[in-house]
Every structure is written in structure tokens, then in C-alpha cells.
């Protein structure tokens, strides 16, 4: 019998994730901005949440305190929100 635990969906346990915190939220695609913000801030209270239209060009620097929400024309989450 194996004692290896499965990695929960949406949790990054790799390099750069020193505290084993959730780094992406695939379950939020299609949800409203307000609902997404609420869930993300429960998981990552220090997150700086940036809301942008889907397709917006953004800088590539990685920030552990930032989560970008890309939204469609109805202000629903269009892409998986991720730390960065």
C-alpha cells in the first residue's frame, strides 16, 4: 500500500511554492468576477487581484502576490486564474 498522497487539483507543490499554497483555480472558469475574488482571497488573502479583458497583453514577470482574472464580455472568468 502506497503512502504517497495525490496532489489536489489546482495546487502547485513544485519549485517556488514554498508554503504549498494553491496557485491556480480551474473551478472558477465561467464564474463571476465577484465570486472568483471571494474564493481566491479565501485561499490566498494577500493576493492582488487584477481584472482584465480576455486577450489583453500583459507583462511576463512572475509575482507570487498577483492573480490575474481574464474576463469575457459578460464579466465571467474566461481563463484559469493563476498566480503570477
Swiss-Prot record:
Inhibits both subtilisin and chymotrypsin. The lineage of its organism: Eukaryota, Viridiplantae, Streptophyta, Embryophyta, Tracheophyta. Residues 1-23 are annotated as: Disordered. The keyword Nucleus does not apply. Transmembrane segments: none annotated. One of its GO terms (biological process) is response to wounding. The keyword Repeat does not apply. Keywords: Protease inhibitor, Serine protease inhibitor. GO terms for molecular function: serine-type endopeptidase inhibitor activity. The record marks 60-61 as: Reactive bond. Coiled coil: none annotated. This is Subtilisin-chymotrypsin inhibitor-2A. It comes from the Eukaryota. SUPFAM superfamilies: CI-2 family of serine protease inhibitors (SSF54654). Pfam families: potato_inhibit (PF00280). Belongs to the protease inhibitor I13 (potato type I serine protease inhibitor) family.
Amino acid at each position: 500500500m502506497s503512502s504517497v498522497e495525490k496532489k489536489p487539483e489546482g495546487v502547485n507543490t513544485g519549485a517556488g511554492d514554498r508554503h504549498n499554497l494553491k496557485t491556480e483555480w480551474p473551478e472558477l472558469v465561467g464564474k463571476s468576477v465577484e465570486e472568483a475574488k471571494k474564493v481566491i482571497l479565501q485561499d490566498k488573502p494577500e493576493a492582488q487581484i487584477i481584472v482584465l479583458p480576455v486577450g489583453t497583453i500583459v507583462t511576463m514577470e512572475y509575482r507570487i502576490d498577483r492573480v490575474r482574472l481574464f474576463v469575457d464580455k459578460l464579466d465571467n472568468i474566461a481563463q484559469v486564474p493563476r498566480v503570477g
